Amino acid sequence: MEWVLQRSYFKTGTLGALFVNGKFRCFTIELPWRENRRNVSCIPEGRYEVKPRISNKFGNHLILVDVPQRSLILLHPANDALGELQGCIAPVSELSGIARGLHSRRALERLLVIHRDAVERQEAVYLTVTYNAHEYLRTLSKTHPAVFPHPAGGGD
């Protein structure tokens, strides 16, 4: 099963849209790109296997396998990337600002069901992380510049 995370980078965070087999499933929030430095940067673009994981802190969640120069990169609930993430990815149902979202647990639960169904069919799940300046982000940066500044690296 193929999941694709299409990201837009901003100075203070990274926003994404996650698609499963081509269908939009949720938004994501992450830390800004800071040269893949541990605990302060989102992960590099690439293709990663997604596996289930359980911990006392997050309960059921997902982990990305073999992220270069990183370990324990999780998909777990968080609504404020700068305050709650250390390089992981948080699925959210709605975006509320750069690196901020709403209803993260709900979004994660949907992904867990999709992942579990794939595992039951003995399908491996892969996440491809890529750059894509989405039209919705360009539009939001024009209509709400205080909340959604232009993506890092330029305007349109």
What are the roles of these predicted feature ranges?
Residues M1-Y126, T130-G153:
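Cell wall/extracellular polymer interaction/catalysis modules
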